[in-house]
From Swiss-Prot:
Gene Ontology CC: external side of plasma membrane; extracellular space; lysosome
Cell compartments where the protein resides: Secreted
The protein's name: Gamete and mating-type specific protein A
Matching CDD domains: CAP_euk, Peptidase_C1A
Region of interest: Disordered: 171-242
Signal peptide: 1-19
Native source organism of the sequence: Dictyostelium discoideum (Social amoeba)
Length: 448
């Protein structure tokens, strides 16, 4: 079994700089695991969960696998003997072992003891926590490596655990209540479980139910985004009645790193591309909005968000540029809505109805943020038109829809996992079905 922590990520082949856990880091990992098993978050175990034994053989095999920097899980996981997770931080200097382990611990609150699996409505991964407290696992090993552009840490547990439908340990009570209520608005931030969700009908509510946060009034007038002195020619109408491709109006592919900020990246990418469509592509390589500004200002930050909240929050104050509030891939405490330097402004935002026809009609005007469900097959996408073998009804990730090809009936999306993923950071998805639950919720777009 295998799952990637917080974000579903692929890692390209790179040359290793150095690797290995320090004695202090190993002790931190051991201490966390001892605490998780001796005092588990959740119902009291019927019997004490035995402490895991550090297995040097597992650790060495895992180290050898990680040092390849190819993003693949070890053969122990591939053969199904071990449960395994990986977490990476980019750039290297952002590596934070305690934050990684804290994120795993947070997953305990999202385990549904009645359903015997992660709370499907919470859209927060809890499976890594079940690996760590699986009562039948007896030993484990962990490893760390530093590649040129990222740091990776991984743990592998023997024998494998974390199976959906099986409790990680036997509680004293037989039917405990779920530890966390399901939120009313999806938070597409965390890795998808490998087990498909039940095929229940998609919600019929026309827009997300969580109210958008109140926009703070700036204390001083914020400078507006400078517009080109002469408007650029508009894009020629597509030759087909439905086919459209806005790829040539995209800023470079970004990488959200070890932070559940896909919602911010998709929303800022929509702003950037729609600006270029209206005013020309002179700033195509330089226009970059601050995703950190969004992560700092909107509730939950690296733990999730929604495009509607993003566009509503920054409609009045505007959003900072990357150079003024650079991305750190962590939830900060300083929400900046005013400054002496220019902020990027837009007029308003809207959303589409939950139909293919409505989505394609809006796509003719420019890219639209869409929510999708990501599973292991999605994360391993390389090229071609992806067709999910499983029909999902929930979502856990936000991307930017940039095109549609009528001949192949396929969408084209821009992701935020770096240019080494998929087709240089992009992906094509069949539009012949809604297996990824695109129409479970409304899709959003900004206007100028």
């Amino acid at each position: 079994m295998k799952l990637i922590l917080v974000l579903l990520c692929l890692i390209s082949t790179l040359f290793v700089v150095k690797g290995g856990l320090s004695p202090t880091e190993q002790q931190i990992i051991v201490s966390y695991h001892n605490k998780w098993r001796s005092s588990p978050i959740g119902p009291t175990p019927s019997t004490t969960i035995p402490a895991l034994k550090w297995n040097a053989t597992i650790a060495a095999a895992l180290q050898s696998s990680l040092d390849k920097c190819d993003g693949k899980f070890s053969t122990m996981s591939q053969y199904g003997t071990n449960s395994e997770w990986q977490s990476w931080w980019t750039p290297n200097t952002y590596f934070n072992l305690n934050a990684t382990l804290d994120n795993i611990q947070k997953g305990a609150s999202f385990y549904d003891w009645n359903a015997k699996g992660c709370n499907s409505s919470a859209n927060y991964n809890c499976q890594l926590w079940t690996y760590a407290v699986w009562s039948k696992s007896t030993s484990y090993g962990c490893a760390k490596t530093i590649c040129p552009d990222k740091s990776e840490v991984s743990c592998s547990y023997y024998p494998a655990g974390g199976f959906k439908g099986v409790l990680p340990y036997t509680p004293k009570t037989t039917t405990p209540a779920p530890t966390t209520p399901a939120p009313t608005t999806p938070k597409p931030t965390t890795p998808a479980p490998t087990t498909p969700k039940p095929t229940t009908p998609a919600p019929t509510t026309p827009k997300p139910t969580t109210p958008a946060p109140t926009t703070p009034k700036p204390t001083t007038p914020a400078p507006t985004t400078p517009k080109p002195t002469t408007p650029a020619p508009t894009t020629p109408a597509p030759t087909s009645t439905l086919t459209v491709d806005w790829t040539s109006y995209q800023t470079p592919i970004r990488d959200q790193g070890q932070c559940g900020s896909c919602w911010a990246f998709a929303s800022s990418a929509a702003l950037e591309s729609r600006y270029l469509i209206k005013y020309g592509t002179a700033q195509k390589s330089t226009l970059q909005l601050s995703n950190q500004n969004a992560v700092n200002c909107i509730a939950s930050g690296c733990n999730g968000g929604w495009s509607g909240n993003y566009f509503n929050f920054f409609k009045t104050p505007g959003i900072a540029y990357e150079k003024d509030d650079p991305y750190k891939a962590v939830t900060g405490t300083s929400c900046i809505t005013t400054s002496s330097v220019a902020r990027f402004k837009y007029t308003n935002y809207g959303y589409t109805e939950k139909t293919k026809a409505a989505l394609l009609a809006e796509l003719k005007k420019g890219p639209v943020t869409i929510a999708v469900y990501v599973d292991s097959a999605f994360q391993n996408y390389k090229s071609g038109i992806y067709n999910s073998a499983t029909k999902y009804t929930g979502i856990n990730h936000l991307v930017l829809l940039v095109g549609y090809d009528q001949a192949t009936d396929a969408y084209k999306i821009k992701n935020s996992w770096g240019s080494w993923w998929g087709e240089s950071g992009y992906m094509r998805i069949t539009a012949s079905n809604d297996n990824l639950a695109i129409f479970a919720y409304n899709s959003y777009y900004p206007t100028f």
